[in-house]
Amino acid sequence: FQPGTHWRYSTCADILGAVVEVVSGMRFGEFLRKEFFEPLDMVDTGFYVPESKRNRLVTAYKRTENGLVPWTSTHLAVGVYDREPAFESGGAGLVSTLEDYSHFADMLLAGGTYEGRRILSPATVACMTQAQLKDAVRRDMWDSLDGYSYGHLMRICAEPGRIAGLACEGEYGWDGWLGCYFANAPQDQ
């Protein structure tokens, strides 16, 4: 389909990560470290967990008919954090802490700055955190995303009355593979 006519969840973030590698001449993780993690003081974020920090990595669980059991499977190598991955995905696989993730969320709320340092331009933050999909295109989204739109790599609350959980209009955020989630509500600052 033509861009702007439909919505489909895709591997676009993975492709963007590969483009970043070609343009920057760096591995994706190195680019993220230099451009985001270091300026944002994100000291516990990356695509693998060093041996010295593995005791801090929580065990993920899944619900089965016999109760909760540790999650041991992987998907596209996401879940294997004891070594650097061959492919650093633009769409999955980062490991972080609540503290580190909050620095990224705070930077977005501050319009692209963190502790006086410019990380992203205000225009980039606006592109990420404002609804970009036309109403007709939003109809293509999964039922579980009813009431949401998308910015660029960010989910945006467009109609809070249609959302199954707690949300307010303009709230934006993202969720991770094993249930982590962040949301900013800029109007509530």
List PLM regions with ranges.
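Conserved strand-loop elements at the edges of beta-sheets that form or border functional pockets
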Residues: 9, 174-176
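Short, surface-exposed beta-strand/loop micro-motifs that present aromatic residues
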Residues: 171, 178-187
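Residues at beta-strand starts and edge strands
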Residues: 150, 188-189
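Short, surface-exposed loop or secondary-structure junction motifs
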Residues: 1-169
